[in-house]
Amino acid sequence: MRTHYCGQLNAALDGQIVTLCGWAHRRRDHGGVIFIDLRDREGLAQVVCDPDRADTFKIAESVRNEFCLKITGKVRPRPAGTTNANLASGEIEILCHEIEVLNPSVTPPFQLDEDNLSENVRLLHRVIDLRRPQMQNNLMLRYKTSRAFRRFLDDNGFIDIETPMLTKSTPEGARDYLVPSRVHPGQFFALPQSPQLFKQLLMVAGYDRYYQIVKCFRDEDLRADRQPEFTQVDIETSFMSEAEIMALTEKLIRTVFKEAIDVDLPDFPRMTYAEAMHRFGSDKPDLRVTLELTEVTDAFKDVAFKVFAGVANSEGGRIAAMRIPGGATLTRGEIDAYTQFVGIYGAKGLAYIKVNDASQINETGLQSPIVKNLSEASLKAVIERTGAQSGDLIFFGADKAKIVNDALGALRIKIGHEKGFVTGAKWAPLWVIDFPMFEYDDESKRWTACHHPFTSPKDEHLDLLVSDPGKCLAKAYDLALNGWELGGGSVRIHRSDVQEKVFSALNIGPEEQQAKFGFLLDALKYGAPPHGGLAFGLDRIVTMMTGAESIRDVIAFPKTQRAQCLLTDAPSGVDEKQLRELHIRLRQKVETQVEVGQP
């Protein structure tokens, strides 16, 4: 039906007859001459309809926004002074010879150039929203990014292999989406949270290098960077060390950013998990922010201020200081707002000291309600360790280490961007390595896996699996960029005896091991090769590339933060016949639970 896309037209086509198909983005009547901006996925083209062609002009008069049109005409230069440098076709226009309305449109629920639209309105009318140039640019970039991943992986010997969507429910950290089986009453499939076990089995089967751009599912509470179904670039390889996997992956990400958005990423420094938490309170720190945390726990063990002394002498407590250069000018209102902010992360308060005169380590030089209850030695230690100068402010976090890290880590980012404590770099990648294998869950009184139960411990820490799991480090690595986790992975356990020890450390007994992971343990006994890999969140990567506020802006049909699709009204109820076929009966009071096995 057409010869060209609108965005492909340029001055080189001057004098040629072209046929375009698309939508009327805007129609303007200028004193007897009608201009139609025709839009398709590649861009806009200006079409000129003059009264000399009466039939064509009459149709043009009836055209309204979002009419679907087919237009044939002659390419010609725009008159002097009317070119548009913002358009690929901005030097030319189309003199309309023929116009056909392929389908008229009712009045759209909003104009495509409206800025102040609520997200719910956009998601309810997603088809119209997807016509907006910004959304089309986002999804085109998503395609280019996926293509760049595929090209690199194909060129480096990776094989694209599909893994099952209907699989077994296994504990991987989040709730599974369950699918009831009609032919096996009372039993359920689960939608995969990742292809983790299947890609490991493919390595055991000898496929050496695997990849897949795949949908994954997690039934978890949503945030700006989460969706119940999301896309990851999943990678696994055999006979490669931790360092070799990271080197190949770094080359992959550099290639993808260069091909997709023409960005040359800077060096990828490496930092241990312990250092990242110590200095930044985060395992995915934004290195563009120059503020850092300073450890001062030991300085407050003997002070009169019980809030600090209690934490300093407790197991698992941490007191960290964060120096804000020039922060003594912060108002009481600003400090109160920051105090309220850290409360989101469980902090009970936000102590501070204004450094009016760094040479006087007393109430004259230091201004704060807590100074009188702190010793000169403790105050001197804080000033020296933070490097505080006159005119600075020091914030303190004092609580369990996790709360301090979460609260001050988030405050660091907030103040850093609000007050301009950032470097000029646009991109700041970072490898975080040497993660702990386990973390202790106080609520369940047991160890849990920091990554997943299939991550290999460091060779020199194998004995710690039994003797001291808390000190055991993993062959795990995460790639962070600008404070976002782009992806993460690990070398996997390839010996069944080691896998059994890790399960035991996680309080998964022999019977449960066989019931849930027997197929994996058996496979590892058949000469499983050393293997490892990682996965990248495609949605997050494209979000960063576009600068979008939410990953919902780079997904064609996303769910809301309540895990709903407003366009199709999903999830929705089903009729009684379908429930009977699945051997499910809803409780009288509508709840999320179901009773299984009842006809």
From Swiss-Prot:
Alphabetical GO biological process terms: aspartyl-tRNA aminoacylation
Gene Ontology CC terms: cytoplasm
Keywords: Aminoacyl-tRNA synthetase, ATP-binding, Cytoplasm, Ligase, Nucleotide-binding, Protein biosynthesis
Residues annotated as binding ATP: 218-220, 227, 485, 537-540
Disulfide topology: none
Single Gene Ontology MF annotation: aspartate-tRNA(Asn) ligase activity
Keyword set includes Cell membrane: no
Reactions this protein catalyses: tRNA(Asx) + L-aspartate + ATP = L-aspartyl-tRNA(Asx) + AMP + diphosphate
Residues at the site labelled Important for tRNA non-discrimination: 30, 81
Residues given in the record as L-aspartate binding sites: 172, 218, 451, 492
EC number(s) given by UniProt: 6.1.1.23
UniProt KW Protein biosynthesis keyword: yes
Region annotation (Aspartate) ranges: 196-199
One protein family per Pfam: tRNA_anti-codon
Top EC class, one word: ligase
Localization per Swiss-Prot or TrEMBL: Cytoplasm
HAMAP family listed in its UniProt record: Asp_tRNA_synth_type1
Function summary: Aspartyl-tRNA synthetase with relaxed tRNA specificity since it is able to aspartylate not only its cognate tRNA(Asp) but also tRNA(Asn). Reaction proceeds in two steps: L-aspartate is first activated by ATP to form Asp-AMP and then transferred to the acceptor end of tRNA(Asp/Asn).
Subunit structure: Homodimer.
Family designation: Belongs to the class-II aminoacyl-tRNA synthetase family. Type 1 subfamily.
Record-given protein name: Aspartate--tRNA(Asp/Asn) ligase
Origin species: Dechloromonas aromatica (strain RCB)
